[in-house]
C-alpha cells in the first residue's frame, strides 16, 4: 500500500470536482446555486459522504489488482474531464464526468488487464450489495436525509 503525494492530490481533486458537480446537480445548476446557496452547500456536504468512499474504493480496487500482478499503478486525474463535468453540471444541472484513471505500467496478459479493468466496477457492485444488505436489515435509518432518502440510498 503506497500512495504517492501526487496520487493523493489527484484523488482529492477528483473527489472535490465530483462533489461540486453533484452539488450543482442537486440544485439544478448555477442559477439554483445562486438562488439557494445553502442547499448547494448542503448538497455538496451530503454528496461527499457516500461519494468519497465509493470513488476511492473503486480507484484503489484497480490499483490493488494491478499491484497484485506486479505492475506500477497510480490514479491520475484528468483536469479537462473534471472541468467538463463541473461546467456541464453548472449549466444544465446534470453531468457526465471523466475524472481520470488508474495508470498501469508493466507486463500483463490480456486476461490480467481485463481483471484490472473490472476491479473498480466490481468493487462498486460489492459496495451496493453491502448498502442493500444494510437497508434490508433496517440499518439505513438516519435523520440526515436528502430528498427523503438516507445516505445508503445513494451509495
Which ranges hold each PLM region?
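Hydrophobic transmembrane alpha-helices and their immediate loop junctions
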Residues: 1-155
